[in-house]
From Swiss-Prot:
Subunit field text: Part of the 50S ribosomal subunit.
GO terms for cellular component: large ribosomal subunit
Protein name: Large ribosomal subunit protein uL1
Keywords linked to the UniProt accession: Repressor, Ribonucleoprotein, Ribosomal protein, RNA-binding, rRNA-binding, Translation regulation, tRNA-binding
GO BP annotations, alphabetical order: regulation of translation; translation
Similarity comment: Belongs to the universal ribosomal protein uL1 family.
The protein's role, per its UniProt record: Binds directly to 23S rRNA. The L1 stalk is quite mobile in the ribosome, and is involved in E site tRNA release. Protein L1 is also a translational repressor protein, it controls the translation of the L11 operon by binding to its mRNA.
Record-linked PANTHER family: 54S RIBOSOMAL PROTEIN L1, MITOCHONDRIAL, LARGE RIBOSOMAL SUBUNIT PROTEIN UL1M
Matches recorded under Pfam families: Ribosomal_L1
GO molecular function: rRNA binding; structural constituent of ribosome; tRNA binding
Matching InterPro entries: Ribosom_uL1_bac-type, Ribosomal_uL1, Ribosomal_uL1-like, Ribosomal_uL1/biogenesis, Ribosomal_uL1_3-a/b-sand, Ribosomal_uL1_CS
Length: 229
């Protein structure tokens, strides 16, 4: 514990808490100040000036990072017949119907993404209390309720991330791993930022991005200059 505190203090000394950094500077600092003994995840956290109580200001979606996330996602697909075969051929880790529902209801959760064809949603709906709180429930807005299961599986395996603004307008997302080259992390960030900027509601007033930080697992949040975006 003492060693960790010492590492945290050392990291804090390298970061000026009164300064807002460029994206390139923030990424470099995130890599430099990371003290986790594993390949830590690099994340971004936005605070958006939106009112999610208004239907037209809810932000939710998905995108594929150009350089992936550095994480191999375990993909589960609810499908039958030809669509089930397509999912398997595309690399889905688990494909099924009632058998998977029973398994999940028994406590099994060894998967990261859930995809379903539209006709399976009545069945998948039974798992709402389990999947919903874990943000695993398939949704058309994130491309996880679809007839094109092969594409959905391939994207999920190839760096697809989902995002959603919470009640306070906060949006968090993974942009890669500490082991990534800095320019790859910057490229991923810029791709995600473009997505967030394009998602700005037409009715949102004032400054859209009010705060933005980049951090690593167990790391220190590094403030990014929103005016540089």
């Amino acid at each position: 514990m003492a060693k960790k505190s010492k590492q945290l203090r050392a990291a804090l000394e390298k970061i000026d808490s009164t300064k807002a950094y460029s994206v390139e500077e923030a990424v470099a600092l995130a890599k430099e100040t990371n003290f986790a003994k594993f390949d830590a995840t690099v994340e971004v956290a936005y605070n958006l000036n939106i009112d999610v109580k208004k239907a037209d200001q809810q932000i939710r979606g998905a995108m594929v990072l150009p350089n992936g996330t550095g994480k191999t996602s375990r993909v589960l697909v609810f499908a039958r017949g030809a669509k089930a075969e397509e999912a398997k051929a595309a690399g889905a880790d688990f494909v099924g119907e009632d058998d998977l529902v029973a398994k999940i209801n028994d406590g099994w959760l060894d998967f990261d993404v859930v995809i379903a064809t539209p006709d399976m949603m009545a069945l998948v709906g039974r798992l709402g209390r389990v999947l919903g709180p874990r943000n695993l429930m398939p949704n058309p807005k994130t491309g996880t309720v679809t007839m094109d299961v092969a594409k959905a599986v391939e994207e999920s395996k190839g760096g697809k991330i989902t995002y959603r603004a919470d009640r306070a307008g906060n949006v968090q997302a993974i942009i890669g791993k500490v082991s990534f080259e800095a320019d790859k992390l910057v490229e991923n960030f810029k791709a995600f930022n473009d997505t967030i900027q394009k998602a700005k509601p037409a009715t949102a007033k004032g400054t859209y991005v009010t705060n933005l930080t980049i951090t690593t697992t167990q790391g220190v949040g590094i403030k990014v200059d929103v005016n540089s975006l």
